[in-house]
């Protein structure tokens, strides 16, 4: 198994005066009429393997496989405005009807820091579930648990972060509960006694905390989303991690209850 992450970092500050007569952008308004690029970073992530297949004890063949290939671009436009874009080359779908994005586009958001302790994230982003396996960079995970493998990890929406202190963070998030219409999610159709939700949102409260010089790390979250009228999905996800030097162990506890089975 081969894992490669190639970062290409470009960090500098570039300033340009606004062209006379041109409508100023949001960034120019925030920075007093200047275009500022604080930093930019591009990462290429590759996870490949050689696979040998057996049927019982009989050798059935061998092949090389690119399990995950991703391109990531992120950085700071201004000291309080950052961006993050990530695309996967292992999956593709036509743009979904709700968010108008293909599943290959995993992340596309901007983060605005309005105070040292408060910030907002707008765009397609991580759904703020708890758990170590869910939070860690997926390029490092060989095989996801069945629960995480079926979760919809990225959705369009908005979230707010409150950094209570260096060891405690509280996040509030509202995102789409799904990317497409009901007929794309439930191929057999909805039950006769329910109708399509007019506001198919998922609401999440996420608490992240660190203890004992960050040796103990907790990532807990509670989520509720409307699937259809009078049908809801509930998630309670807990991540408990101990990390000290080369030692890392974790216990993820995850529970879901759904009014309609999506999986």
Sequence positions of predicted segments:
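Outer membrane beta-barrel
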Residues: 29-52, 59-180, 208-212
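N-terminal regions that are enriched for targeting/export leaders
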Residues: 21-25, 30
